[in-house]
C-alpha cells in the first residue's frame, strides 16, 4: 500500500514538473517597435528576454532585429525555406496573411483569461478567416497630424491652430487659413508641410489625409467588399491637395518618402507633418530641434468639413508560427504570455512602444498632455483594412494614383482606375 502511494506521488510530481518546466530554443524576431533607455536598438528586447530567462532558464531565445526596409523579405525568405522564426512582433496586415495561409498557431488558449480586458476592435483585427485569434494584440495608437508649437508661437500663428478646442476637431477652411499664413511668414527654405508620395511607405498618412478634408470620402464601403474612393468628394479632396502643392501651401513630395517628410518636421524645416504618432515621437526623442532646442509636437486630427475626422491606427502584437516541435511551441507561448501579462514587463513593453495598451489591465504611464490627448483620438478610429485581400496591391495602385494626379492627369479618371484595380485585388 505504501509502495502504491509513493508511486502515484512520484508520477504526479514528475507530471507537474514537466508542465512547469520547458526546455527549448526559440527564435524571436521583431521590427524596431521598441525604444530603449540606452538609445541602442535592440537593447529593450534583450532586457525583456533576460527578465524572462531569469524565471525560465531552460528556455533559450535567439533574437533578431529586423529593419523596416527589408524585414518583410527576410521573413518571407525564411518562410519559403521552411524555417520561419517561432515568434514575430508585427501588425495584423502581415500576420493575418500568414494565418490565412495556415502558417500560424492559434492563440485563443494563451488569450483565454485575457480577452475580456482587451479592446473588442483589436480582437476583431487579430482574427483570421476562421475567427480564431492569431495575433495577441498588445499595443495600439492613432496616426495623426502634428504641428511645431514653438514655431507657431514665434510666428504669431498659434491662435490659428484650434488645439485648445475640445477634442480639437477643425475644418478644411481653418487648415487652409493656417497654411496660407505659414507660407507668407516662413523663410523660403522652409515649408508649411509636405505631401509625400515617392514610395508606398507611410501611405496610411496620405490616405487618412485624403479621406478627410471636405469629408464624406471613404476608401471602402461598410462591409469592405468594394473600394469607393472615386466619389465627387474624393475627387475634390485630391484636387485640393494637388492645387495646394502647386501654390506652395504644401511642398510637393514627389521625391520624398514619409521618413524624409517626418525628418523635415523633426528638424523644423516643415511646420507640420501629416503623419505622426506617439510611437514615432518616441523614436525621435533627442532628435527634434527648433532653434537648438527640443520642441513640442501638437497632435491634431485631420481637418474634416463634413463630420468627425477619420483616422488610421496602428495595432501591434505577436504571432507564433506552427512547428512540429511541441516543446518549442509551449516555450514560445510561455514567452508571449510573459511579454503580455507580466506585472512588471507588460507595462514596460507598452512604454517602450510609445503607444497605448490593448488591455485595460495595463495603464498609460505619462503626464504629457499631448500624449494623453492621443487617447481622445482613439474615438476617431476609422476602418482597419490592412488585413483584407489585395491590400499590398492596393497600396501600389494608391501610389500610382497620387503620382498620376500630381502630374496633371484628370483626377476623376485617375481615381476610377484606382477603384477598378483595387476592386480586382479584392478577388485574389
Question: What kind of region is each of these model predictions?
Answer:
Residues 176-183, 222-258:
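Glycine-centered hinge/linker elements that transmit conformational signals in sensory
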Residues 14, 297-300, 348-404:
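Long, aromatic- and glycine/proline-rich binding clefts that accommodate carbohydrate-like moieties
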Residues 130-139, 143, 171-226, 270:
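Extracytoplasmic/periplasmic solute-binding protein
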Residues 67, 90-144, 153, 173-174, ...:
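Hinge/lid segment of periplasmic solute-binding proteins
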Residues 6-8, 12-97, 112, 159, ...:
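Conserved N-terminal structural module of periplasmic/extracytoplasmic solute-binding proteins
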Residues 108-119, 165-168, 193-199, 216-236, ...:
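Short, solvent-exposed loop/beta-turn-alpha elements that line the ligand-binding surface or hinge
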Residues 60, 246-247, 287-355, 400, ...:
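Extracytoplasmic/periplasmic substrate-recognition and gating elements
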Residues 65-74, 168-174, 253-266:
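Short helix-initiation/N-cap motifs at beta->coil->alpha
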Amino acid at each position: 500500500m505504501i509502495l502504491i502511494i509513493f508511486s502515484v506521488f512520484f508520477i504526479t510530481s514528475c507530471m507537474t514538473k514537466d508542465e512547469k518546466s520547458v526546455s527549448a530554443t526559440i527564435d524571436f524576431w521583431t521590427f524596431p517597435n521598441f525604444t530603449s533607455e540606452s538609445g541602442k536598438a535592440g537593447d529593450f528586447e534583450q532586457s525583456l528576454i533576460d527578465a524572462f530567462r531569469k524565471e525560465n532558464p531552460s528556455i533559450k531565445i535567439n533574437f533578431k532585429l529586423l529593419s523596416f526596409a527589408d524585414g518583410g523579405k527576410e521573413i518571407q525568405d525564411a518562410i519559403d525555406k521552411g524555417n520561419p522564426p517561432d515568434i514575430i512582433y508585427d501588425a495584423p496586415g502581415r500576420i493575418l496573411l500568414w494565418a490565412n495561409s495556415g502558417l500560424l498557431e492559434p492563440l485563443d488558449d494563451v488569450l483565454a483569461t485575457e480577452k475580456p480586458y482587451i479592446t473588442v476592435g483589436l480582437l476583431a483585427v487579430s482574427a483570421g478567416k476562421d475567427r480564431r485569434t492569431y495575433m495577441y494584440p498588445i499595443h495600439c495608437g492613432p496616426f495623426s497630424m502634428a504641428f511645431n508649437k514653438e514655431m507657431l508661437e514665434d510666428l504669431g500663428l498659434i491662435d490659428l491652430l484650434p488645439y485648445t478646442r475640445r477634442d480639437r476637431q477643425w475644418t478644411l477652411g481653418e487648415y487652409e487659413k493656417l497654411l496660407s499664413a505659414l507660407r507668407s511668414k516662413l523663410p523660403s527654405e522652409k515649408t508649411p508641410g509636405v505631401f509625400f508620395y515617392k514610395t508606398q511607405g507611410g501611405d496610411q498618412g496620405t490616405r487618412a489625409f485624403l479621406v478627410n478634408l471636405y469629408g464624406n470620402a471613404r476608401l471602402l464601403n461598410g462591409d469592405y467588399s468594394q473600394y469607393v474612393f472615386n466619389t465627387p468628394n474624393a475627387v475634390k479632396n485630391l484636387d485640393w491637395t494637388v492645387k495646394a502643392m502647386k501654390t506652395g501651401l504644401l511642398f510637393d513630395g514627389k521625391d520624398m518618402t514619409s521618413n524624409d517628410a517626418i525628418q523635415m518636421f523633426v528638424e523644423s524645416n516643415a511646420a507640420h507633418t501629416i503623419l505622426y504618432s506617439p510611437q514615432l515621437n518616441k523614436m525621435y526623442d533627442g532628435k527634434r530641434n527648433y532653434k537648438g532646442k527640443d520642441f513640442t509636437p501638437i497632435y491634431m486630427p485631420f481637418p474634416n468639413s463634413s463630420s468627425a475626422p477619420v483616422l488610421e491606427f496602428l495595432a501591434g502584437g505577436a504571432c507564433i508560427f506552427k512547428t512540429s516541435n511541441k516543446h518549442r511551441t509551449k516555450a514560445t507561448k510561455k514567452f508571449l504570455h510573459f511579454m503580455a501579462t507580466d506585472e512588471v514587463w507588460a507595462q514596460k513593453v507598452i512604454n517602450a512602444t510609445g503607444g497605448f495598451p490593448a488591455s485595460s489591465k495595463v495603464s498609460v504611464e505619462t503626464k504629457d498632455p499631448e500624449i494623453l490627448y492621443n487617447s481622445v483620438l482613439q474615438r476617431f478610429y476609422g476602418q482597419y483594412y490592412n488585413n483584407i485581400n489585395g491590400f499590398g496591391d492596393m497600396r501600389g495602385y494608391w501610389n500610382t494614383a497620387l503620382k498620376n494626379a500630381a502630374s496633371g492627369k484628370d483626377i476623376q479618371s485617375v481615381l476610377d482606375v484606382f477603384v477598378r484595380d483595387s476592386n480586382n485585388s479584392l478577388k485574389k
